[in-house]
């Protein structure tokens, strides 16, 4: 999708999106190109792999990326890591310049508990550990990963599980709850996930965002952004791979 193709609705949607460049080994040139594009378009954040920090080649100290916030990930994409390993990964990202970290929660906790709707105490304990590793003012996002509970290979996450994760995030001091990255857009899936999470965190300072990574080149991407935003998503993620190669420039 080129700048010439963006109508007013698409341009307004740019303020609600973030760009993801989670290629295992993005080059410095790719990273710089995506951050610069985000800055030009008024996009608020760019996701980068933990190994990309500290980010180099984007300006002087204190004003490296302008208003663009740099986000990293930890425990990505499954969450099947010891919490201390995940916390260490998150802490290193912040120590090396990440403004925000999205941490994938342990699926054993997400789908734990006697009724498999989430082990609230275990989730709170996990998020408290992560919060200590990602101290304020850094932003801690907690996400559901791609691994489902027993008997759930794919498909939407049960509402009760989403509600438990949201409750834990509020109780343990997370800033954002992120839906699963493999939750497909469409009625009864990604939008419904966002609605459930938004209702569960209502009245708190915790916000909700979609974990589904949409294609920046998809003509319908901004329609999906609008639907997810209407459902309660504070931000939506678009894949920045094509931008880093200059195909949309």
Task: Describe every region a protein language model picked out.
Residues 1-2, 6, 10:
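Intrinsically disordered, low-complexity repeat/linker tracts enriched for polar/charged residues
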Residues 9-41, 53-55, 60-72, 76-78, ...:
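Alpha/beta enzyme core
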Residues 44-45:
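Periplasmic-binding protein-like
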């Amino acid at each position: 999708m080129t700048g010439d193709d963006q109508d007013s609705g698409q341009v307004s949607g740019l303020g609600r999106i973030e760009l993801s460049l989670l290629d295992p080994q993005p080059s410095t040139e790719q990273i710089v190109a995506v951050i610069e594009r985000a800055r030009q378009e008024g996009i608020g954040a760019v996701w980068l792999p933990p190994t990309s920090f500290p980010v180099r080649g984007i300006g002087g100290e204190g004003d490296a990326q302008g208003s663009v916030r740099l986000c990293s990930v930890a425990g990505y994409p499954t969450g099947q890591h010891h919490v201390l390993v995940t916390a260490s990964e998150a802490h290193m990202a912040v120590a090396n310049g990440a403004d925000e970290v999205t941490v994938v929660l342990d699926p054993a906790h997400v789908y734990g508990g006697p009724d498999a709707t989430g082990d609230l105490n275990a989730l709170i304990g996990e998020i408290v550990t992560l919060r200590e590793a990602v101290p304020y003012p850094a932003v801690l996002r907690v996400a559901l990963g791609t691994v489902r509970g027993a008997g759930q290979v794919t498909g939407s996450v049960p509402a009760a599980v989403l509600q438990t994760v949201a409750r834990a995030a509020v109780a343990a001091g997370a800033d954002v709850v992120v839906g699963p990255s493999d939750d497909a857009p469409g009625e009864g899936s990604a939008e419904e996930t966002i609605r459930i999470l938004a209702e569960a965190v209502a009245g708190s300072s915790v916000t909700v965002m979609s974990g589904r990574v949409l294609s920046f080149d998809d003509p319908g991407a901004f329609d999906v952004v609008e639907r997810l935003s209407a459902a309660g998503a504070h931000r939506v993620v678009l894949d920045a791979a094509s931008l880093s190669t200059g195909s949309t420039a």
